[in-house]
Amino acid sequence: MERWVKATLPMRSLLQAEAFISGCAAHFDRSLAGDQLSPVRTSTQCWCSNNECSADPRTAAVERRISNLTRAPVRYMEPFQILKYEPGQFYKVHHDQNSGLFTPQGPRVYTFFMYLSTPAEGGGTRFADLDVVMPAVKGNAVIWPSIMDASPSRDEPYTNHEAQPTTVGRKYASNVWVHQFDYRTPADKGCLLTHKNTH
């Protein structure tokens, strides 16, 4: 069976990358690992939701582009999670699937990860089981599965990954997690199962 991560170009203009960074400039907090603080993840994060980031038409255009590429409705996606890594910050090896099968949104099917800046050194995304490191290059993106195509109840075992430390310069990046079902309707109604580790 083929194990894969795929590189793609989600942004038609690098100005779209700047929209995420400027829209989140005043909203960064310590990143969570799942739903809690952890020493395995030391970056800061901003959710592109109900703020300047989500109001920018350039970020909405990227959202539609990802919907077209994944063939998943926008409502199946979590909001963009914007990440900022200062030199030395990291996210140790982890898996992105943290959403239980019993939740209204179902499991995370795909991760769509975009690089919003190019640090001078370091900051790649490493897939240890695949012996692959994707370099952090502004405007590029990587997509990978979190569950098995033939058995959605099983995690994809080959997409454990880590954010390698940026050694020179700052890295900005963004996650988009695509679910099996509609994520935003229950989230907008305040369903706690959309905000907690349930897997």
Description of each model-found segment:
Residues M1-I143, I147-H199:
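Fe(II)/2-oxoglutarate oxygenase catalytic core
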